[in-house]
Amino acid sequence: DSDESRGLGDVYKRQELTGGHPNSLGNTIKVVEHVIVKKNRINSLIKCYSSTDQIVRLRTSNAFKRIFRQKPEWFLDFKHIFLNKISKIKQSSTQWTCAQLFSELVNQLENKEQKKAKKIVSDYLNNSSDWIVLCQSMNALITFNKIDNKTIKENIKIIKKLSKDRRKAVSRLAKKLLSLIKE
């Protein structure tokens, strides 16, 4: 009996990734431990991104960060899904997760994929008001800038705007990016 035929995506949604306090991990660690044993279980976890429950999607994102940090080589088989589908989900936790994954696993992205990831992160900077999305996107730009030193300059307008943001975490990081240009 395969995991797919048993509908583990539904099990994750119903039993493991729902309920509890919205900011808690719930049973995310348990899901990670289950998936890490058998790579094909990722397919069931990916299905959780289609849940209408934003807490399920938040915990799914958290699970993927943990899985890919433990098994970074697994990202190779799923990067296209994150670049082409997951990154388009209009939820802050999903967006900051994509920014983090693209930054942390940039060495697994081919040149064309790096450009796409950079565009996604730039779009997040220009369209999000969530401070975590903004900070993780700027952190990703720092990483991309090490590969292509035009990255920060290409986003200078939004970075200058963010350097005046009322939220200290956002403005401080934007100022750091501006200082990288001057070096």
Regions found by a protein language model. Give the residues of each.
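Single conserved hydrophobic/aromatic residue that forms the stacking wall/gate
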Residues: 1-12
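Alpha-helical scaffold domains
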Residues: 10-183
